[in-house]
């Protein structure tokens, strides 16, 4: 368990660092209020987690240390949206359509509502991204 936590932590560090770096680079070349950095990072994260799980599953290494490092660690540090996307796809592929709809709806609506609640709980005067 400790080894797994360290592996996830290492992957998360590099994923988070890359997220910050890419976000800054994208921010420097885009204008306006649209959150391009977040969208690009989230979409890249979805591609990365799909590639990683596809690769490791094809080789029968879905539970390997490398899989843990790159998926839960790196992709998790890069973006949790990639995990949400992968889990949603799993629900679709296994025919759990009601669970899929519920999961997506609750995640999106609940996420927005809880973000708003967080701003309100902190007494934030506006809903601005730092």
Identify what each model region corresponds to.
Residues 1-130:
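Membrane-interface helix-loop junctions in multi-pass transporters/channels
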